[in-house]
Amino acid sequence: MKPYQRDFIEFAIEQNVLRFGEFTLKSGRVSPYFFNAGLFSSGQALAKLGRFYATSLMEANVPFDVLFGPAYKGIPLATTTAVALYDHHNVDTPYVFNRKEAKTHGEGGSLVGAPLAGNVMIIDDVITAGTAIREVMAIIQQANALPAGVLIALDRQERGQGELSAIQEVERDFGMPVISIVSLNDIMTYLAEQDSPEFAKHLDAVKAYRLQYGI
């Protein structure tokens, strides 16, 4: 685990974005942890979050021409990533996002920002079922652009209905990489490093969950 990944986990815990306990997911599974990127909800938190996204993207070394933020959660994520790429890496990247409902007046259409062209890096928080990414792929194909990859905050490393995770299915179906700032393995490593009975208890619960549902 790299220092920025450890810093990100600490940051997510501080912001109450990453919590440990018992959480019932939409799938009905009872998870020992919960990750809610919507709680990165202040200027300072978003600025810091953008730096983590930008660092992950630069580390991955995947070529891209434009950032795409899927409505709604992906919009602030793509925006703060674009700002951080310029401020901290001197990379000036165009970005674009979609509206859920197309406008019929003014600038019109369902896309806002830079032209959706070339190699597109999709920015989102997590991939749970892959449904949102499939919708984005349709938008990219319609624009005759190419998917470069997906950048997310957390890879849960968890099976879907079959043997693969939603991320593995996206990589298989669309032939593009999914980059994550951290994975569940990184969270487990972080918990193991802490000298705390409480964190040790959480680690045991996460290990058991990973054995049952992990890939």
Curated annotation (Swiss-Prot):
The keyword Glycosyltransferase applies. Orotate binds at residues 34-35, 128, 156. One of its GO terms (cellular component) is cytoplasm. Keywords: Glycosyltransferase, Magnesium, Pyrimidine biosynthesis, Transferase. SUPFAM superfamilies: PRTase-like (SSF53271). This is Orotate phosphoribosyltransferase. GO terms for biological process: 'de novo' pyrimidine nucleobase biosynthetic process; 'de novo' UMP biosynthetic process; pyrimidine ribonucleoside biosynthetic process. Gene3D superfamilies: 3.40.50.2020. Its cofactor is Mg(2+). It catalyses: orotidine 5'-phosphate + diphosphate = orotate + 5-phospho-alpha-D-ribose 1-diphosphate. The gene is pyrE. Belongs to the purine/pyrimidine phosphoribosyltransferase family. PyrE subfamily. NCBIfam families: pyrE. Pfam families: Pribosyltran. It is an enzyme of class 2 (transferase).
